[in-house]
Structures are given as structure tokens and as C-alpha cells.
Design a protein with these regions (language model features):
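Acyl-donor (CoA/ACP) binding surface of acyl/acetyltransferases
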Residues: 2-13, 17, 21, 28, ...
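Generic structural signal for well-ordered secondary structure
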Residues: 18, 27, 41-45
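Generic structural signal for individual residues within well-ordered alpha-helical segments
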Residues: 23-26, 35, 49
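ATP/adenylate-binding site constellation spanning eukaryotic-like Ser/Thr protein kinases
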Residues: 31
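A short gly/proline-enriched turn/hairpin at secondary-structure junctions
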Residues: 34-41
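Active-site rim helix/loop that mediates acceptor-substrate recognition in acyltransferases
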Residues: 41-81
Length: 248
């Protein structure tokens, strides 16, 4: 599942998190407001590059950078063009971990961030979330197989028990967004970081997600190859720890 694959729709474009995105991501995470609502500590640029490597290649993680949608239909995503810095909006992630007290089961934690203030409450977060959720549901067997190959899994088969998200109690927009697609609050009591947990049961079938995509006018869901135009380099060329959601 770590191939260079993008997800295109009428409302948003999702591309794999690559080294060329790290500088922009690093600038986003300097925001005190983002640090608060994502329960994050700022990382150095070098640490961000190491984190990108982890999110891109670890078997228990899946991440995409959220971009503005293309203005015309495309058949492939050109790296550095369709995901140029000016088009980047945030990120969306899935982290899998073993479920306690359940054999051969795991839980998926979602993380969503729309970083620029001007891009929030424009529908980008909802579009990214629904496209990402549909991707997970329609590639679940591959994701579970890959997770079984991670160092955190001791099983040869795996079942996704449910999806969860942690949202700062003051982040009412994100709470409304996740509740609007079926997530339900686990407890009214926030944790040490001021976060509330929300859970999506029955998360493995795409039918409900398909209905929500239609309801919110998110059309033309398509998987596209990402084509590298040039070598992007790494930390020496250019010189997250976040756990929750900022959205529309």
C-alpha cells in the first residue's frame, strides 16, 4: 500500500507524503494554535524528515497530504506540479495498533489537519476524510496484510475493530465534522491533553461512505499514479507527532 498512488476527487486531491512536502509541513507545525489542538510538540526540521520517513514507509501507518483539487481531469499526478507548495492544505493519516483483549484485531486512529486558516470550513476536511475512509474500506485486505508484516503485529491475520479519532474539546468544528459522518463520542471527559475520543463502529463497509460522498457532492473519486518529475532530495538538500484533528 506504499506505492506512489494519489486519490483525486472533485473537492480534494490526496498525495503520498514525500520529502518535498516536509518544509511546508514543518512551517505549519510552528503554529501554537495547531500545536494545541493536535497535542503536538514542535520538531526540528531534521526530526520532521525522520517522521516523514516513518509515516511513508512503516507498515502500521498510512498518510496523505491534502491538496486543492485539479481544475481539469487528469490521468496522473505530476510530483511538484499538482502538489506544489501553494496547493497544499494539510494532511490525513491512519495509524494501526493492536486492540487489547481482542485476538487478531487492531484499531485504526485517524488524524486530520487542514492547516491554513483561509482553507478551513471550505469542505476540504470533509472531502479528504471521506475519500480517505473510502480508500481504507476498499483496500482493507491489503492494509491488514501489510499491518501483519509490521513489528507491532504478532498475527498472520487481522481484523479492523473500529476507527477512532481524538479531538480537542474546544475544536467544535472538527467534532461536528466527525459526528456528521457517524463518529460517536466515547466519553464526555477529556484526557490529559484536553482531547475527547470519538469512535466509528461498523467502519469496514464502503456503502455508507459512498452515500456520504454523494450527499456532500464529492464526485469523481479516482486513484491515480504519482509520477516523479525530478529528484526531490532530502534533509541535506533543503535544510508529528500530532494526534488529532483540525478541519473544516
Amino acid at each position: 500500500m506504499k506505492e506512489s498512488l494519489a486519490i483525486s476527487s472533485s473537492k480534494v486531491l490526496l498525495v503520498p507524503y514525500e520529502k518535498r512536502h516536509v518544509n511546508t509541513y514543518h512551517e505549519w507545525m510552528k503554529s501554537k494554535e495547531i500545536q494545541k489542538v493536535t497535542a503536538s510538540e514542535p520538531l526540528t526540521l531534521k526530526e520532521e524528515y525522520l517522521m516523514q520517513e516513518s509515516w511513508r514507509h512503516d507498515h502500521d501507518k498510512l498518510t496523505f497530504i491534502i491538496c486543492r483539487p485539479t481544475s481539469t481531469p487528469i490521468t496522473k499526478v505530476m510530483a511538484g506540479t499538482h502538489d506544489a507548495n501553494r496547493l497544499l492544505l494539510g494532511d490525513i493519516n491512519l495509524f494501526l495498533f493492536a486492540a487489547q483483549d481482542y485476538n487478531n484485531c487492531c484499531i485504526g486512529e485517524l488524524e486530520l489537519m487542514v492547516a491554513p486558516l483561509h482553507a478551513r470550513r471550505q469542505g476540504y476536511g470533509r472531502a479528504a476524510l471521506l475519500c480517505f475512509l473510502y480508500y481504507i474500506q476498499t483496500h482493507l485486505d491489503e492494509l491488514m496484510t501489510e499491518y501483519c508484516g509490521s513489528k507491532n503485529s504478532k498475527s498472520k491475520t487481522m481484523h479492523l475493530l473500529y476507527l477512532r479519532v481524538k479531538i480537542h474539546s474546544e475544536n467544535t468544528n472538527s467534532i461536528k465534522l466527525f459526528e456528521s459522518i457517524g463518529f460517536r463520542k466515547v466519553s464526555d471527559t477529556a484526557d490529559f491533553f484536553g482531547e475527547l475520543e470519538f469512535k466509528l463502529e461498523n467502519c469496514t463497509e464502503p456503502e455508507t461512505t459512498t452515500e456520504l460522498l454523494e450527499k456532500f457532492g464529492i464526485e469523481a473519486y479516482t486513484k491515480l499514479p504519482c509520477i516523479e518529475e525530478v529528484s526531490t532530495g532530502g534533509f541535506n538538500d533543503e535544510q508529528n507527532n500530532h494526534s488529532t484533528a483540525i478541519s473544516d
